[in-house]
Amino acid sequence: SNFNKEQMEEILSICEVRPTVLQTELHPYHQEKELKAFLKENGMVAQSWYPLGHGDKALLEEPLFAELGKKYGKSSAQVILRWHIQDGNIVIPGSKNPTHIQANFDLFDFALTDEEMDKIAAMNKNARYYTSTPEMLKRYAETVPPVDEQK
């Protein structure tokens, strides 16, 4: 997860089993259009990590989402999740709140127009909430899950 295009090219050049999904940070402030185009060209899809911008109030309180929420009778979070779906992202939002979990399923009785999708596309700032470092990647690579203990 969280690989960039260059890292994915390297993986594809040496892997025996091709990945089909890349989990990466995606939300209206960080849309990764170039990476997603590369994934599509290579038969892969993106799964959105931090689909609601890590709960950033600035994103959730964007006037456009309030306006669209009012139009469709939805919350800003539901509008953002609908954008993900229409933009081709796999989206699995997390919540411990039963009301939010139910609301996360209530996305299929409306669709954003092309113009609305374009307005959201214009919000892209290439702003990440998570940045990995070489040290972190090394730690992840060295992690050995306790598979034998799980038997």
Question: What do these predicted ranges mean?
Answer:
Residues 1-151:
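Beta/alpha (TIM)-barrel catalytic core signal, keyed to glycine-rich beta->alpha loops juxtaposed to Asp/Glu
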